[in-house]
Amino acid sequence: MKTKAGFVALIGKPNAGKSTLLNTLLNAHLALVSHKANATRKLMKCIVPFKDKEWYESQIIFLDTPGLHHQEKLLNQCMLSQALKAMGDAELCVFLASVHDDLKGYEEFLSLCQKPHILALSKIDTATHKQVLQKLQEYQQYDSQFLALVPLSAKKSQNLNALLECISQHLSPSAWLFEKDLMSDEKMRDIYKEIIRESLFDFLSDEIPYESDVMIDKFIEEERIDKVYARIIVEKESQKKIVIGKNGVNIKRIGTNARLKMQEVGEKKVFLNLQVIAQKSWSKEEKSLQKLGYIHRRNRD
């Protein structure tokens, strides 16, 4: 069997559809998806197998990154750092741009990325044929910069094989780097954490999801059930009250939604215990971000 393998950084502005694309390619719910922009905070590896036209069995390891953006808050700086590191570590990059975005995001990406890349135009199912053609023509001025320009829709599964074929063509022959059926090397406790965060985005409005995070205090993995004890961290006491809700109605909804998603991903029953705490300025404190896994002591960039 001829094989290829390689790391591919998936880069884009917030809400370009990176996580939706990966979940569709995996046919599983691993990456955090929200209609709110900039939900992804940590890099995640997602492993997609693909047989290309030259009969290579390719193992494409996508690095799902936080959206490219610039803010002074320490948490946001950590998120940008992860995206930049992924670009440096990858063999190839895919820049995902919404058909509705202007070209500024791609131009910023060009100033940051030194690796060969594919430009993918997402959400084409939400635009007219004329709008898609117009956007493709706008990007053609940069045709000397990208390896290929691929219009696609993750929700409608349009042109996804074309994207994978293009990626596979530019990977080097190599033995596979991970086991055959592995979709991610993420620990289950980290996947569960992201599922809880996704539920916060699903049920809470305004700034609260952006000023909150999740700490897994205890994770007990048994044959038939996973037991998860977690804290939702917010910035203010007023936010804590909203997360809990009157008579606990909000926290119950968040918990039930998260637990059902966990059971689907983990393929077993899940016991979930959620607590809510207020910790002022947690997103600006290095010690707090270390505990949450955004900063590593050996590498604080």
From Swiss-Prot:
Coiled coil: none annotated. Residues 64-67 are annotated as: G3. GO terms for biological process: ribosomal small subunit assembly. Residues 4-173 form the Era-type G domain. Keywords: Cell inner membrane, Cell membrane, Cytoplasm, GTP-binding, Membrane, Nucleotide-binding, Ribosome biogenesis, RNA-binding, rRNA-binding. It is found in: Cytoplasm; Cell inner membrane. Residues 38-42 are annotated as: G2. One of its GO terms (molecular function) is GTP binding. Residues 152-154 are annotated as: G5. GTP binds at residues 12-19, 64-68, 122-125. GO terms for cellular component: cytosol; plasma membrane. It is a peripheral membrane protein. Residues 204-280 form the KH type-2 domain. Monomer. NCBIfam families: era, PRK00089.1, small_GTP. HAMAP family: GTPase_Era. Belongs to the TRAFAC class TrmE-Era-EngA-EngB-Septin-like GTPase superfamily. Era GTPase family. An essential GTPase that binds both GDP and GTP, with rapid nucleotide exchange. Plays a role in 16S rRNA processing and 30S ribosomal subunit biogenesis and possibly also in cell cycle regulation and energy metabolism. This is GTPase Era.
